A protein has these predicted regions:
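C-terminal scaffold of the Radical SAM
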Residues: 1-183
Length: 183
C-alpha cells in the first residue's frame, strides 16, 4: 500500500490485458495500517483487487513499538473499518508471535481481539530474526558479547514460542478458522 494507487491500477490493468485472469481470481495486496485511504481502497477495487492482507502484527502498542512498526492498534482499526466500509469482504490480518517481551497471555489477547473482528483469514506466524537486519542489530548484545547472539532475556524462549503456537492452533480451530499454512 506504499505504492501510489494509480501505479497499482496501471500494473493490474496491464496484467489483465496481457493474460487471461479468471473472473473469480483472488487478487490480494499487502497493506500497512495507517497507509490506506478510502481513495486507495476504491482504486484497488477498480483494479480488481478483492483481498486485503493487513499487517497488524499485534494489538499491543508496546509490542508494535518494540517491532519498530509505524502504526498503533487504533490506526489499524481505522484501516480495517475503511476496508469494510469500502466493501472488502476478504480480509486477512497478520499476527506475530515470539515478539520482545511477549507472553502467551499477551499473544492470546491479541488473537482473541482479532477474532472478534471476524476477518476471513488470520495469518499467525512466529518472528524470525535474520542476522544483518535492523531488528537483529537493535536486539543484539553489546560489542563484547555480539558473538553470543541476541538479547534472549527479552525474547520468549523456545518453550514459550511453542506454547503460543499450539494455543494459536487450538484457539483458531475453535473459532472456525482452518489452518492451511505453517510459518
Amino acid at each position: 500500500s506504499w505504492l501510489e494507487e494509480n501505479l497499482i491500477y496501471t500494473v493490474l490493468q496491464q496484467v489483465a490485458s496481457s493474460f487471461h485472469v479468471e473472473a473469480d481470481a483472488e487478487i490480494s495486496i499487502e497493506c500497512n495500517p495507517g497507509t490506506v485511504t478510502a481513495k486507495k481502497l476504491n482504486v484497488y477495487q477498480s483494479a480488481g483487487i478483492n483481498r486485503l492482507s493487513i499487517g497488524l502484527q499485534s494489538t499491543n502498542n508496546e509490542e508494535l513499538k518494540a517491532l519498530g512498526r509505524i502504526h498503533t492498534y487504533d490506526q489499524f482499526l481505522k484501516t480495517y473499518e475503511l476496508a469494510r466500509n469500502a466493501g472488502f469482504e476478504n480480509i486477512n490480518i497478520d499476527l506475530m508471535s515470539g515478539l520482545p517481551y511477549q507472553t502467551l497471555d499477551k499473544f492470546l489477547e491479541s488473537l482473541q481481539t482479532v477474532i472478534r473482528l471476524k476477518p476471513e483469514h488470520i495469518s499467525a506466524y512466529s518472528l524470525i530474526i535474520e542476522k544483518g537486519t535492523p531488528f537483529y542489530e537493535r536486539y543484539k548484545f553489546d560489542a563484547v558479547k555480539q558473538e553470543a547472539g541476541l538479547h534472549t532475556e527479552i525474547l520468549p524462549d523456545e518453550d514459550e514460542v511453542y506454547r503460543i503456537y499450539k494455543a494459536t492452533q487450538d484457539v483458531l480451530k475453535q473459532a472456525g478458522y482452518r489452518q492451511y499454512e505453517i510459518s
